[in-house]
């Protein structure tokens, strides 16, 4: 236990920290956004060339001195980027969700990404954006998926090892 605590202040073991819940404690983790955000928002960050937001606003519920909020909605404002219009991105967690209207009234899953555009919406129903659908479906019935334009990852561990050996930097 002492080894696991590392630089965190010493405290007795409690089952609220292990095996998974450590992520939500300020001394140990980064909350839902830090834990899963790097996976969930990777697709919009890469596709829309998002970098540094110019404003961030947060609405939080259940905030304590020791843990991340139980729920939050975070609004990120991004400026124009390489000819792309400014945009706003929202992060929801703790069971909070946007309006089901973004999926034409269907129930929203517990995780996912939705990109709302002028001509339609792109929705990925999981943490890793491994699949997606274009909505409304009838508007994209003849859509042809483009050929992959980014290099495929051999996996986090392999990328890390290659980078350590002086190879290309990891995609992450």
Annotated model-derived regions:
Residues 1-30, 34-172:
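Contiguous beta-strand/loop segments that form the cofactor/metal-binding neighborhood of enzyme cores
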């Amino acid at each position: 236990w002492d080894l696991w605590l590392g630089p965190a202040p010493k405290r007795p073991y409690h089952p609220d920290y292990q095996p998974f819940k450590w992520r939500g404690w300020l001394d140990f983790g980064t909350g839902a956004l830090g834990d899963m955000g790097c996976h969930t928002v990777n697709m919009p960050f890469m596709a829309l060339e998002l970098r540094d937001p110019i404003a961030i606003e947060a609405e939080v519920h259940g905030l304590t001195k020791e843990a991340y909020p139980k729920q939050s909605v975070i609004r990120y404002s991004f400026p124009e980027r390489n000819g792309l219009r400014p945009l706003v991105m929202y992060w929801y967690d703790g069971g909070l969700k946007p309006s089901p209207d973004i999926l034409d009234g269907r129930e929203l899953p517990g995780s996912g990404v939705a990109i709302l555009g002028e001509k339609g919406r792109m929705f990925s129903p999981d943490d890793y954006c491994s699949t997606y659908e274009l909505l409304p479906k009838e508007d994209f019935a003849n859509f042809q998926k483009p050929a992959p334009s980014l290099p495929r990852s051999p996996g986090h561990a392999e990328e890390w090892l290659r980078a350590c050996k002086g190879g290309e930097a990891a995609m992450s």
